[in-house]
Amino acid sequence: MRTATIPAPRTAGSYSVGIVCLGNICRSPMGEIVLRERVDEAGLSRHVRVASCGTGGWHVGNAMDHRAASALLSWGYDPSEHRAQQLAPHWFAEHDLLLAMDAANLAEMGGRSERVHLFRDHDPVAPGADVPDPYYGGEQGFNDVLHMVERVAAGLVATLQRTPGVTGPTGLP
């Protein structure tokens, strides 16, 4: 298994992750909420900020899809504060790492770069695979996405913990 790497932070002791999908009402907010919780559990919330957005603007200001919210609630997460945002040029300057949920989102973001990756590049089971969009399917699709997101979030936290500069000059909390 290869170990995914992430770029060093632009500012020592501060790291910002942005998660991007199409409409910011299903996959990326699920990723944001789960990763933020894992970051908090790891004691990194003082150093790591997590946000999400969509490449399209259809849902800006809306809460997440009720099926995504239901899946999160059933796993013990609180989705109530999420409001959809659209990707804008400032996201590239403000985030140390942007994670696209699928290849189409990645293409909308200009393709891979040092700071733009696929979300599942950090998945030990299927590195580089897409997170399928559950929007046009049933509830099981949302639970499947949540399983993927949980797995990737654990890997990302481990990567954040070992990346020099994330938590300060030495990389230690």
Go through the PLM ranges and name each one:
Residues 2-93, 158-172:
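Conserved active-site segments centered on acidic
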Residues 2-5, 97, 103-173:
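Phosphate-binding/catalytic loops
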Residues 29, 102-103:
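Alpha-helix N-cap/helix-start capping motif
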